[in-house]
Amino acid sequence: MKTRFLEQIEEHTGIINKIVNLYADNTDDRQDLRQEILLQAWRSYASFENRSKFSTWLYRVCLNTALVFHRKSKRMVTVDIDNIKPLSNNNEVHHGAELLYLAVKQLPPAERSIIILHLDGYANEEIAEIIGISKNNAAVKLHRIKQTLTDKVRNEANRV
Protein backbone atom coordinates (compact mmCIF):
# COMPACT_ATOMS: atom_id res chain seq x y z
CA MET A 1 0.00 0.00 0.00
CA LYS A 2 2.82 2.39 0.91
CA THR A 3 4.65 1.76 -2.36
CA ARG A 4 1.52 2.34 -4.46
CA PHE A 5 0.77 5.55 -2.52
CA LEU A 6 4.28 6.90 -3.08
CA GLU A 7 4.13 6.02 -6.79
CA GLN A 8 0.84 7.85 -7.23
CA ILE A 9 2.05 10.87 -5.25
CA GLU A 10 5.18 11.01 -7.42
CA GLU A 11 3.06 10.77 -10.56
CA HIS A 12 0.79 13.62 -9.41
CA THR A 13 3.32 15.83 -7.63
CA GLY A 14 2.38 18.70 -9.95
CA ILE A 15 -1.03 18.94 -8.28
CA ILE A 16 0.59 19.32 -4.87
CA ASN A 17 3.10 21.87 -6.16
CA LYS A 18 0.38 23.94 -7.81
CA ILE A 19 -1.78 24.10 -4.69
CA VAL A 20 1.19 24.81 -2.42
CA ASN A 21 2.41 27.66 -4.63
CA LEU A 22 -1.04 29.23 -4.89
CA TYR A 23 -1.94 29.00 -1.20
CA ALA A 24 1.38 29.71 0.54
CA ASP A 25 3.32 32.89 -0.02
CA ASN A 26 6.69 32.15 1.56
CA THR A 27 9.14 29.26 1.69
CA ASP A 28 8.35 28.21 5.26
CA ASP A 29 4.61 28.17 4.64
CA ARG A 30 5.13 26.23 1.40
CA GLN A 31 7.15 23.58 3.23
CA ASP A 32 4.59 23.38 6.03
CA LEU A 33 1.66 23.13 3.63
CA ARG A 34 3.39 20.51 1.46
CA GLN A 35 4.12 18.41 4.55
CA GLU A 36 0.55 18.80 5.81
CA ILE A 37 -0.88 17.79 2.42
CA LEU A 38 1.30 14.68 2.27
CA LEU A 39 0.35 13.76 5.84
CA GLN A 40 -3.37 14.23 5.18
CA ALA A 41 -3.14 12.29 1.92
CA TRP A 42 -1.41 9.38 3.65
CA ARG A 43 -3.89 9.40 6.56
CA SER A 44 -6.86 9.28 4.22
CA TYR A 45 -5.35 7.00 1.57
CA ALA A 46 -6.91 3.91 3.13
CA SER A 47 -10.34 5.41 2.46
CA PHE A 48 -9.57 6.01 -1.24
CA GLU A 49 -11.85 3.54 -2.99
CA ASN A 50 -10.99 4.14 -6.66
CA ARG A 51 -14.52 5.47 -7.30
CA SER A 52 -12.85 8.51 -8.83
CA LYS A 53 -9.46 9.10 -10.37
CA PHE A 54 -6.56 9.39 -7.95
CA SER A 55 -5.88 12.90 -9.24
CA THR A 56 -9.45 13.97 -8.40
CA TRP A 57 -9.14 12.53 -4.90
CA LEU A 58 -5.72 14.15 -4.41
CA TYR A 59 -7.02 17.53 -5.57
CA ARG A 60 -9.75 17.33 -2.95
CA VAL A 61 -7.27 16.43 -0.21
CA CYS A 62 -4.90 19.21 -1.32
CA LEU A 63 -7.59 21.86 -1.54
CA ASN A 64 -9.22 20.93 1.76
CA THR A 65 -5.84 20.90 3.49
CA ALA A 66 -4.87 24.24 1.93
CA LEU A 67 -8.15 25.82 3.02
CA VAL A 68 -7.72 24.57 6.60
CA PHE A 69 -4.10 25.73 6.56
CA HIS A 70 -5.21 29.15 5.35
CA ARG A 71 -7.90 29.40 8.06
CA LYS A 72 -5.45 28.36 10.77
CA SER A 73 -2.96 30.98 9.70
CA LYS A 74 -5.76 33.59 9.96
CA ARG A 75 -3.97 35.73 7.45
CA MET A 76 -5.62 37.54 4.64
CA VAL A 77 -4.13 36.76 1.29
CA THR A 78 -2.15 39.81 0.30
CA VAL A 79 -0.01 40.05 -2.74
CA ASP A 80 3.18 42.05 -2.80
CA ILE A 81 3.71 42.48 -6.52
CA ASP A 82 7.46 42.92 -6.02
CA ASN A 83 7.71 39.45 -4.46
CA ILE A 84 5.57 37.56 -6.96
CA LYS A 85 7.47 34.97 -8.92
CA PRO A 86 6.90 35.28 -12.65
CA LEU A 87 5.36 32.33 -14.40
CA SER A 88 8.65 31.78 -16.15
CA ASN A 89 12.14 33.21 -16.25
CA ASN A 90 11.66 33.62 -19.98
CA ASN A 91 11.30 37.32 -20.82
CA GLU A 92 8.83 36.47 -23.55
CA VAL A 93 6.10 35.46 -21.08
CA HIS A 94 2.95 37.22 -22.09
CA HIS A 95 2.11 40.10 -19.77
CA GLY A 96 -1.57 39.07 -19.72
CA ALA A 97 -0.67 35.67 -18.28
CA GLU A 98 1.25 37.34 -15.47
CA LEU A 99 -1.69 39.62 -14.74
CA LEU A 100 -4.00 36.60 -14.64
CA TYR A 101 -1.64 34.79 -12.26
CA LEU A 102 -1.63 37.80 -9.93
CA ALA A 103 -5.40 38.09 -10.10
CA VAL A 104 -5.85 34.39 -9.25
CA LYS A 105 -3.52 34.78 -6.25
CA GLN A 106 -5.75 37.61 -4.98
CA LEU A 107 -8.96 35.55 -5.05
CA PRO A 108 -10.38 34.18 -1.81
CA PRO A 109 -9.18 30.59 -1.24
CA ALA A 110 -12.48 28.90 -2.14
CA GLU A 111 -12.74 30.80 -5.43
CA ARG A 112 -9.08 30.12 -6.16
CA SER A 113 -9.78 26.39 -5.82
CA ILE A 114 -12.57 26.49 -8.38
CA ILE A 115 -10.64 28.45 -11.00
CA ILE A 116 -7.52 26.29 -10.56
CA LEU A 117 -9.55 23.18 -11.28
CA HIS A 118 -11.18 24.85 -14.29
CA LEU A 119 -7.82 25.97 -15.68
CA ASP A 120 -6.58 22.41 -15.27
CA GLY A 121 -9.35 21.21 -17.56
CA TYR A 122 -11.80 19.78 -15.04
CA ALA A 123 -15.46 19.89 -16.08
CA ASN A 124 -18.06 21.58 -13.88
CA GLU A 125 -19.27 18.16 -12.76
CA GLU A 126 -15.78 17.18 -11.58
CA ILE A 127 -15.22 20.56 -9.93
CA ALA A 128 -18.50 20.15 -8.06
CA GLU A 129 -17.47 16.69 -6.86
CA ILE A 130 -14.03 17.84 -5.68
CA ILE A 131 -15.27 21.01 -3.97
CA GLY A 132 -18.43 19.42 -2.59
CA ILE A 133 -21.06 21.61 -4.26
CA SER A 134 -23.73 21.04 -6.91
CA LYS A 135 -22.87 21.13 -10.61
CA ASN A 136 -25.09 24.19 -11.11
CA ASN A 137 -23.48 25.99 -8.17
CA ALA A 138 -20.05 25.22 -9.61
CA ALA A 139 -21.10 26.67 -12.98
CA VAL A 140 -22.49 29.85 -11.40
CA LYS A 141 -19.45 30.34 -9.18
CA LEU A 142 -17.11 29.73 -12.10
CA HIS A 143 -18.94 32.30 -14.22
CA ARG A 144 -18.68 34.89 -11.44
CA ILE A 145 -15.02 34.12 -10.83
CA LYS A 146 -14.23 34.50 -14.54
CA GLN A 147 -15.98 37.87 -14.54
CA THR A 148 -14.03 38.96 -11.44
CA LEU A 149 -10.75 37.89 -13.02
CA THR A 150 -11.60 39.62 -16.29
CA ASP A 151 -12.31 42.84 -14.39
CA LYS A 152 -9.13 42.58 -12.29
CA VAL A 153 -6.91 41.88 -15.30
CA ARG A 154 -8.55 44.63 -17.34
CA ASN A 155 -8.17 47.16 -14.49
CA GLU A 156 -4.54 46.23 -13.91
CA ALA A 157 -3.75 46.36 -17.64
CA ASN A 158 -5.30 49.84 -17.83
CA ARG A 159 -3.14 51.01 -14.92
CA VAL A 160 0.06 50.00 -16.67
Predicted feature locations:
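Structural recognition of an alpha-helix C-terminal capping motif at a helix-to-coil junction
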Residues: K18, D32-L39, R43, S52-N64
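A short, charge-rich alpha-helical start-of-domain segment used by transcription regulators
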Residues: M1-K18, Q31
